Amino acid sequence: MKLKEIDRTAMQAWSPAQNHPIYLATGTSAQQLDATFSTNASLEIFELDLSDPSLDMKSCATFSSSHRYHKLIWGPHKMDSKGDVSGVLIAGGENGNIILYDPSKIIAGDKEVVIAQKDKHTGPVRALDVNIFQTNLVASGANESEIYIWDLNNFATPMTPGAKTQPPEDISCIAWNRQVQHILASASPSGRATVWDLRKNEPIIKVSDHSNRMHCSGLAWHPDVATQMVLASEDDRLPVVQMWDLRFASSPLRVLENHARGILAIAWSMADPELLLSCGKDAKILCSNPNTGEVLYELPTNTQWCFDIQWCPRNPAVLSAASFDGRIRVYSIMGGSIDGLRQKQVDKLSSSFGNLDPFGTGQPLPPLQIPQQTSQHSIVLPLKKPPKWIRRPVGASFSFGGKLVTFENVTGQPQQGAEQPRRQPVFISQVVTEKDFLSRSEQLQHVVQSQGFISYCQKKIDASQTDFEKNVWSFLKVNFEEDSRGKYLELLGYRREDLGEKIALALNRVDGSDVALKDSDRVAQSDGEESPAEEGQLLGERIKEEKQECDFLPSAGGGTFNISVSGDIDGLITRALLTGNFESAVDLCLHDNRMADAIILAIAGGQELLAQTQKKYFAKSQSKITRLITAVVMKNWKEIVESCDLKNWREALAAVLTYAKPDEFSALCDLLGARLESEGDSLLRTQACLCYICAGNVERLVACWTKAQDGSNPLSLQDLIEKVVILRKAVQLTQALDTNTVGALLAEKMSQYANLLAAQGSIAAALAFLPDNTNQPDIVQLRDRLCRAQGRSVPGQESSRSSYEGQPLPKGGPGPLAGHPQVSRVQSQQYYPQVRIAPTVTTWSDRTPTALPSHPPAACPSDTQGGNPPPPGFIMHGNVVPNSPAPLPTSPGHMHSQPPPYPQPQPYQPAQQYSLGTGGSAVYRPQQPVAPPASKRYPNAPYVSPVASYSGQPHMYTAQPASSPTSSSAPLPPPPSSGASFQHGGPGAPPSSSAYALPPGTTGTPPAASELPASQRTGPQNGWNDPPALNRVPKKKKLPENFMPPVPITSPIMNPGGDPQPQGLQQQPSASGPRSSHASFPQPHLAGGQPFHGIQQPLAQTGMPPSFSKPNTEGAPGAPIGNTIQHVQALPTEKITKKPIPDEHLILKTTFEDLIQRCLSSATDPQTKRKLDDASKRLECLYDKLRDQTLSPTIISGLHSIARSIETRNYSEGLTVHTHIVSTSNFSETSAFMPVLKVVLSQASKLGV
């Protein structure tokens, strides 16, 4: 699909891949003339803007040259890391000269753009190429077999790759190898190609076609394979592209015969080796797969030949072609629609003519219509197959913070037998699309930090493009200056100096500056308020200054006067004054329309009378400024704001600025702004922003600005945020208000702004601008994402934890062990027989296992009645027993010098329910070492402290204190008849030699077979001391939370008959209550035959030999077991909950199991069925690895391929894939399941299922 077009007969060169934006340089082509027959030459640079739908390319610069060019390339030499316009333009001239240009100077308009030039060659320079490994090396070819290697760092003297080839001939094309930096190839029109080794300074191989009709017009190396190259022929008798492999240089590896006439140029894509461009004399531009010869794409061109074609280095889907009709066209191989382009051309043509009447018909021209028959050709199809850069496994995804995560299929040979799979790189890039937006945001942040608000506002005033923008920033600037109200008045056009001059002229005075100065001082000192005394003083000063000749009160020595008491108005006034009736006197004066006398008498009558008189005066007065005087005198500023004509909004705002009190100033400005918004036209609506700035109302300013301005682009939002931030700072400094409170609209805009900053990678700035005191879900979510992106915790939120970390422990209870981790996961509820075992790994500590009787022990001590509540996040299973008897608090005793007689309480342990077993003596043979948690019916049952070892031996946890013996009212069971312990082991461990005996009368239900381990479900059981069967390579796993250290196999040997009951505790009375029924329950034993010390163990065991203090964990062959396993029953194993297989790999298990079942249903041979049963069991190892996700991606991919072959019943293909996996992967990864899988595939193939 054609994207752009340039009307030039020129050679072309794309800017390097590092350069952004993309440029295309053109130089006037030699030996060609355009339609104007101009002999001038030029070098131009165009910018590729794919966002512009037009065909035109923007010309960035033009340089008039005295040379015409046969070849033009743009090398990345001295390219800076920022990707600015740089590099070197290298041109091959028609007179044997090579010229180096600086493209950055050409774009800048500099006249000195030539870096260097040499005319070393004989004849025109038709071949040029830059070494991609050493970009300072340039190869050039010309006539007489001349090949030179130029060093751009030392351009004076070139090098030669070796002696000239004989006979001398022209060099039509030259190319550096794409994999080996010292290999160079050249070709001539005679059809011969020569490969040079610069280390040896000689040709190493020559390639030529035996037909002697091969005229080379193009040469290109394979982008990935160092020994392969293609040659193009321009001979019409042999219009082919030959692909050669230098390892088999006797004949071409492949020949592409897709052109009907000679080929003029070729270009091999560096991004996809399966894309080879070629253009020929048949006016076709083809994109072919050189490996298969298939034509993947044919570009829609005209009937003109193309003599040069090139891929864009930065955008691999874009290419350019220069044709003999004087045009350079830019195409895309990804296809698209040309409807928009056609419509744009039609609109352009219509706009040129408009609706004029060029033919004098008196009728306007109808709109130009697009021919309907061309609509079916409006869609240009892309390549037949996706190119490599968008082909799997390649992908890209944007993540939060403007990050672009990409991955690609990196070529490389897998290492045989390597322990680690080959790593595939994932690239994380920061995408910045709004550079101006980021720059202005950073400037705003700097201003806020440096407090340089006045200078910032002044810069904005100077840079303002409109008067309104200038006024807004002027009003914002005034907030940070002294006498802000006076400055506001000046901005509204009311300068006091100008007013004083006008008043002086009106009073025939010469200088009015004194009047203005005194007015200014009066307003500044009063701050909008005037007392009657101040008014009188001002009036007296005015009278004195004007030096009035008349006196209101003549002195007594001025003569006598007559006091009239006649019946007229004057007499009545006189009588009222003589009797002190000022109200009547004032009414008479008003009745006689003597307003001045009424006001003067009202002043003498007091403030109340004066106010009544003023109202009556204003009611009768009908002058133009009566309402203004009324508002000023009555201090009714709201009247001015609500009733004035909106055309006089400046005057109303000036009155408010002059007279309003500070507590009502903001409200009046808001009221005026609201009137301008609701009642005014579009021009007046924008002026409301000035009122809101004076009021300091940020929320109203945001609403008004949003209505008046277009906020659809980031820079418009930046304009608003700048004003909002500056105004908030001004309000914070001048009005001392809480600016942290934001409204819904402002919060939305700040959230949008923070989102934009985050999208550009400015996470810290986005978090700084995000409002803090809002609970809007979008803002809370954004704040959480920003904090997580910075690796910080969310303010005001604590991470949810189910462990006890940071929670205070109940008094009397032990804390966690020092130096041992605490597990934060609460155990899942499972079912076991009713024997309570203290887990070794809990939510508090890692401890030695301790077996407890089934009845509940006493609750943990607490200083408060009812016990301490469980910490937050703790999950309580079952019902709480509130009336558990509490023993005395424990206290620290001797540090491991003797075993503790009673368990140390562990409060708030999650309890779980056990089921009782019946009949038979089931043997406990766990595959994994587990221990059940406490009983569900006693959720407050404390954990038991670890039992110390024998005297004289160190405890395994030296940080664990032992408690002193205390009395307890809890019932005590009798001694056991035999030692009871757990037998621990790995997979296939031998069973325990002893188990717990159930109390008489206890009934229950045995666990289901599905809940038992495999060792209890299938096959005969081994003896207790047989060696374990190693069925797979063991690997070290993380200990589970309920892990219990092993009880040594010597337990029944060292203590075959059990321990006698201590005499000191036999006579203790049992407590009343339901627990007395458990008195006959046997006492469990600990490791090494040691009985449980928590309830019935004596205070010390001094007679134990030292050799028994450290249990022996190795079994004694042939040791007698006696009657130790009679009348006892062991605990069933814990049902181990396995992680689910990931959904994407669940198909593997389904497919394999289904295949085994099909084979079992078809098999008749018992031996075959045994193999399949064994395979079904051994494939569990594969499923475990899938759950743990420990298999390499290569093996996973191969297993899915095998599953697909099973679905299609192509077992031979599955066996082939199986062989490939085994031969290319690590043996230790596949040895456990791949042989079994091969057996299943072989049996399926044999049975034909």
Swiss-Prot record:
Decide whether keyword Phosphoprotein is in the record: yes
Region spans: Interaction with PDCD6: 800-1142
- Sites where Phosphothreonine occurs are at 1190
Repeat positions for WD: 4-47, 64-111, 120-160, 166-206, 209-254, 258-298, 301-342, 397-429
**Crosslink site: Glycyl lysine isopeptide (Lys-Gly) (interchain with G-Cter in ubiquitin):** 647, 1246
Which SMART domains does the UniProt record give? Answer: WD40
Q: In which tissues is it expressed?
A: Ubiquitously expressed.
| Post-translational modification comment from the UniProt entry | Monoubiquitinated by the BCR(KLHL12) E3 ubiquitin ligase complex, leading to regulate the size of COPII coats.
GO cellular component terms, semicolon-separated: COPII vesicle coat; COPII-coated ER to Golgi transport vesicle; cytoplasm; endoplasmic reticulum; endoplasmic reticulum exit site; endoplasmic reticulum membrane; endosome; perinuclear region of cytoplasm
Q: Name one Pfam family in it.
A: TPR_Sec16
Q: Give the keywords, sorted.
A: Cytoplasm, Cytoplasmic vesicle, Endoplasmic reticulum, ER-Golgi transport, Isopeptide bond, Membrane, Methylation, Phosphoprotein, Protein transport, Repeat, Transport, Ubl conjugation, WD repeat
* Name of the protein this chain belongs to: Protein transport protein Sec31A
Tell me which species this is from. Rattus norvegicus
